Structures are given as C-alpha cells and as structure tokens.
C-alpha cells in the first residue's frame, strides 16, 4: 500500500542517517530512492511515479542552485508550465516536479501561493544555504520536524519514525495522546512524541545558519454565495485535474 512519495532531510551531512531514514519511508515510494548531500544539507526521496515515470523526473530534482524534494500532486501544473514557457523557461520533463522548482526560481516563496494541489515541499537554495518547507492548506500530505536549539540541528521527514531514529530520547507526549483519546483527532503542532512536531497546514518553515522561523503562509480561500450549479461545476473541474496521470488510475470508495 503506497502513500505517494517520502521525503527526508536535515541541515548537516550524514549519509548513513539519510539511508536509514529512506529505508523507513521506502513504503511510500517503490519506484526510486536517491539522495543529495553537501556539508550543510542532506535530503532523500522515495518516489512513487505518477507523472512522467521516466528517471529524468526522479528526485531530489536539481535546477541551478535549487534542490527540490516533494511529496504530492500539483493539479494546475500545466497552466503554470505554460506561464513559465512564456517567460522563457525550457523543460526537459513532463512532470509537475520541474514546474515547481522553476516557478520557485522565478518567484521564490510567492510561487507556493500559485500551487493548487496536495503537497509537502522542501526546497534548498545552495547559494544562500537556506531551506524552505511548506505544506498544503488542507494538510493532506504529512511533514514532521525536530529542532535542537543547542546543536542547531534541524531534521524533517514524511514519517515520525523517520525522525525518531535520530533522537537519543524518545518520550511520549501525554498531552497529545490525551487530546487524541478524547477527541479522536489532534490538530495541534504537537505529536505523540515530545520534540517531534508537525508542519501545520499552510505553514512555511525557513531554516538558515542553524536557526529556523515559521509562519502561516497559505490561507484556505473560501468563496461565499455559492450556488448549486457553481459547486457542481467546480467539483467536476477539480476531479478532472486530479485524474491527470501517466499510469493507470483507479477509484476506491468506502
């Protein structure tokens, strides 16, 4: 059972650790596993290929000084690709991956506001040594992180278990457990483990020189005064975009 790609990374160099983390997230992507590493950044990716299954779209995806690793789908990538082509960008793949990184190259973090889809994205800028993490407004695609204020080490992963293997102490967060047991959900930043946190839906995290900051960046835009015809038309449009794929598609209802 595959969940669409896994991403792992941290702001230091440790090849053994990225391999161990990638093994933990391997169930999320059977089609390719790879990593990028420098002295100040390491990132790995487990790929479940949906668009452009060719190896040219494997991740981490590098364009100039940018390194991208993401999990998800961008439903409006063809429209965005057209805009980029008009700006003079050329494309070597037919994936949404290349669209994300080149749009970021053009517009920086403002590019995230153009994306329609479900995603957890990591972008690293080698020139500024700055890491960006962002998650879609609904929070469909998971992304977790750990930050040690003493060592300045920052670690992120699609799975909590991917982070736990790097921690010396694994302590339960009883407040989060209590919240879940009472309400059958946990919408807070905290997870079941202390010192492991969620990137919240729509949140942007920036890490540079061992320091990180976070802010709400993407807002869920709700339209008022909708009539039944408009709702049906929008549902039909969005469903159509979600069926874009270069591999067989199935629909399961439960």
Language-model segments: what does each one mean?
Residues 3-254:
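Cysteine-centered catalytic environments shared across enzyme families
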């Amino acid at each position: 059972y595959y969940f669409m790609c896994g991403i792992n990374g941290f702001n230091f160099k440790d090849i053994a650790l990225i391999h161990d983390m990638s093994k933990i997230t391997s169930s999320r992507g059977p089609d390719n596993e790879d990593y990028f590493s420098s002295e100040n950044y390491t990132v790995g990716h487990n790929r479940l290929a949906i668009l452009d299954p060719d190896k040219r779209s494997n991740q981490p995806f590098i364009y100039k000084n940018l390194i991208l690793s993401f999990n998800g789908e961008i439903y409006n990538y063809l429209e965005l690709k057209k805009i980029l082509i008009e700006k003079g960008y050329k494309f070597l793949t037919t994936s949404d991956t290349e669209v994300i990184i080149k749009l970021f190259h053009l517009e920086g973090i403002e590019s995230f506001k153009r994306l329609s889809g479900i995603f957890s994205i990591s972008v690293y800028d080698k020139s500024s040594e700055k890491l960006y993490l962002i998650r879609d407004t609904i929070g469909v695609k998971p992304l977790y992180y750990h930050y040690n204020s003493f060592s300045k080490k920052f670690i992120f992963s699609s799975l909590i278990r991917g982070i736990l293997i790097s921690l010396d102490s694994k302590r339960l967060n009883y407040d989060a457990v209590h919240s879940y047991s009472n309400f059958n959900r946990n919408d807070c930043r905290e997870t079941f483990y202390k010192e492991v946190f969620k990137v919240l839906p729509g949140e942007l995290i920036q890490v540079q020189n061992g320091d990180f900051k976070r802010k709400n960046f993407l807002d869920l835009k709700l339209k008022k005064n909708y009539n039944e015809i408009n709702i049906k038309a929008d549902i039909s449009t969005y469903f159509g975009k979600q069926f874009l794929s270069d591999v067989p598609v199935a629909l399961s209802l439960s």
